[in-house]
A protein has these predicted regions:
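ATP-binding N-terminal substructure of ATP-dependent carboxylate-amine bond-forming enzymes
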Residues: 1-94
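Active-site nucleotide/adenylate-binding loops and adjacent lid/helix of ATP-dependent enzymes
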Residues: 4-5, 99-163
Length: 163
């Protein structure tokens, strides 16, 4: 099986490291990859936002299976495009990736479907959020909506930290 891993970070390096051990892995490619990944997979410097170029690569190299590491290609619908072209993928559809992309979407979906979740308030401007923070007990958790590369959550111990 010819396998393509999308990404260039530690997560993708770990994926490549594990995948290349499989007896089912005939060829392993990574886009764009990194110096470390190039030691275990054939890397190609394709922008992960360029869905058409990735699709063309898959067709040219007869890729059987794609594993997508980073959130952005998932939220931009790469899985949907590849699957619609009969290329198997590991990763959620664009709609499914909304659970990762938007904390507000996920909280509202949980509430609509009676899935237990923590209390929350959403704000579209700093001033309203600050007024609310003046009325709550600490510690409290503040989360940015949208992708934040794993850095969108802050646990605050007091109002000064919340600001």
């Amino acid at each position: 099986m010819k396998i393509l891993v999308i990404g260039s970070g530690g997560r993708e390096h770990a994926l490549c490291h594990s995948i290349q051990k499989s007896k089912d892995c005939e060829n392993l490619y990574c886009v764009p990859g990194s110096d470390a990944i190039s030691l275990i997979a054939e890397c190609h410097p394709i922008d992960t936002k360029n869905k058409q170029r990735i699709l063309n690569f898959c067709k040219e190299y007869n890729i059987s299976f794609v594993v997508i590491g980073p959130e952005i290609p998932l939220t931009e619908g790469l899985v949907d495009i590849l699957i619609s072209n009969n290329i198997k993928c590991f990763g959620p559809s664009q709609k499914g990736a909304m659970l990762e992309k938007s904390k507000i979407f996920t909280k509202e979906l949980c509430n609509e479907n009676n899935v237990p979740t923590g209390k929350y308030k959403k704000f579209s401007n700093y001033e309203d959020a600050l007024i609310y923070c003046q009325s709550i007990n600490f510690p409290s958790v503040i989360k940015a909506d949208g992708l934040a590369a794993g850095k969108g959550v802050i646990i605050t111990e007091n109002l000064k930290e919340a600001k």
